Amino acid sequence: MKIAILSRDGTLYSCRRLREAAQQRGHQVEILDPLSCYMNVSPVASSIHYKGRQLPHFDAVIPRIGSAITYYGTAALRQFELLGSYPLNESVAITRARDKLRSLQLLARQGIDLPLTGIAHSPDDTSDLIAMVGGAPLVVKLVEGTQGIGVVLAETRQAAESVIDAFRGLNAHILVQEYIAEAKGCDIRCLVVGNEVVAAIERRAKEGDFRSNLHRGGMATVAQISDEERAIAIKATQTLGLDVAGVDILRATRGPLVMEVNASPGLEGVETTTGVDIASRMIAWIERQATPEFCLKIGG
């Protein structure tokens, strides 16, 4: 197969591993910067051009699109879809997962347990918003934040009100969640490919922090997950229509709670911690799914 990887930086670990895995399985791979793709949208001769040439047909496309370029990145991916390429995560599913409010609404509708969550823009009654999630301590996040940026733990009601008021001054959407103290700064990242959790790690926040993101200095170890956690991770992935996802789960007293579903999970932390060849699992999934019938259907 001819496979395109959409990424702004082909030297990143995940891109390198996906290219290696695909080539080892006999596929041709090209890494394309989605922002350098430009498109001819036509009822008779739609095409995608890249650095002065028209791109050939690709059997499959692997989107590694950062949140900062979601709009144009998914637009480029959608053009590949319309031309009959199989996407490892459809553009509509990526957009759905990147919209934190929409994704939480969909997960909740499917009965997937979440931390108590309130979302607001300019709440007239900050006290009521805080009470909605059970009071302090609580976590205040910018809806557009990623990798732990724009996330604050407010230990008291007064601190929570101050943080919410400060964020409101940024003219930003605010997400307020209950603080799961019993998780003790840890979460579980389940890497889902298709209908299977292929690997799971426990991420522990560095001392003095509560954010477990590896980009923030968190530590990772292999996680043993329960059947319930496994089922929830798969259900969350399928609810958002994703083929591949990193599902972040908090272990609360009342059971596992889904914190976030990442549509473009990094492979480095999970592969190096667990030793699982996730990249090859992803390519194998493409091989099973990128049938002519599927590509004809998604191409419209």
Curated annotation (Swiss-Prot):
Which sites bind ATP?
A: 141, 178-179, 187, 211-213
Name its co-factor(s): Mg(2+); Mn(2+)
Under InterPro entries, the record lists: ATP-grasp, ATP-grasp_RimK-type, ATP_grasp_subdomain_1, RimK, Rimk_N, Rp_bS6_RimK/Lys_biosynth_LsyX
Please state the Enzyme Commission number of this protein: 6.3.2.-
Name the Gene3D superfamilies for this protein.
3.40.50.20, ATP-grasp fold, A domain, ATP-grasp fold, B domain
Residues bound to Mg(2+) 1: 248, 260
Q: Which residues form the ATP-grasp domain?
A: 104-287
The GO molecular function terms of this record are: ATP binding; metal ion binding; ribosomal S6-glutamic acid ligase activity
Q: How is the cofactor bound?
A: Binds 2 magnesium or manganese ions per subunit.
Q: Which Pfam families match?
A: RimK (PF08443), Rimk_N (PF18030)
Q: Which residues participate in Mn(2+) 1 binding?
A: 248, 260
From which residue to which does the signal peptide run? none
Similarity remark:
Belongs to the RimK family.
Q: Known PANTHER family for this protein?
A: RIBOSOMAL PROTEIN BS6--L-GLUTAMATE LIGASE (PTHR21621:SF7), RIBOSOMAL PROTEIN S6 MODIFICATION PROTEIN (PTHR21621)
List the protein's name.
Probable alpha-L-glutamate ligase
* Record organism: Klebsiella pneumoniae (strain 342)
Q: What is the lineage of its organism?
A: Bacteria, Pseudomonadati, Pseudomonadota, Gammaproteobacteria, Enterobacterales
Q: Which gene encodes it?
A: rimK
